[in-house]
Amino acid sequence: MIIIDLEWNCGSDYSGFDEILQIGAVRIKTLGGCILDTFNIYVKPQVNTTLHPAAVKLPELWHSFADGVCFPVAFLKFREWARHEKDYIAWGEDDFRVLQQNVTYWNLPPLSIRAAFNLQRGFGHHQTAKR
């Protein structure tokens, strides 16, 4: 099971393309279990090179410009790291939408996802149920 967290820039021109700047992930066997492995890679912006004001506030953003690789390289490294995993979790539903948008834009083979879970939605339901 892979928990993924993306950071992205929607660009200052509000073009509608959310360009990924960072892919972070951890591998776990079960929810609540130990972290088995980690992945982190910075992506150099190629499309939206002018940052949206919200993207400027992202921590360690300078890594994307200084150490970042193009998205196709970053995604292929992520796929290699994720291997044949088919269960993915993200903090919010936008991560999967943005990932698919970038994969489509760069004409890359998509991840084979059997199940995609949104922790933010689950956490919200849990908090509501506790009241």
What residue ranges belong to the model's regions?
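A short alpha->loop->secondary-structure connector
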Residues: 103-114
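Conserved non-catalytic scaffold segment of RNase H-like nuclease domains
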Residues: 1-97, 101-104
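Short alpha-helix plus adjacent loop in nuclease-associated cores
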Residues: 116-131
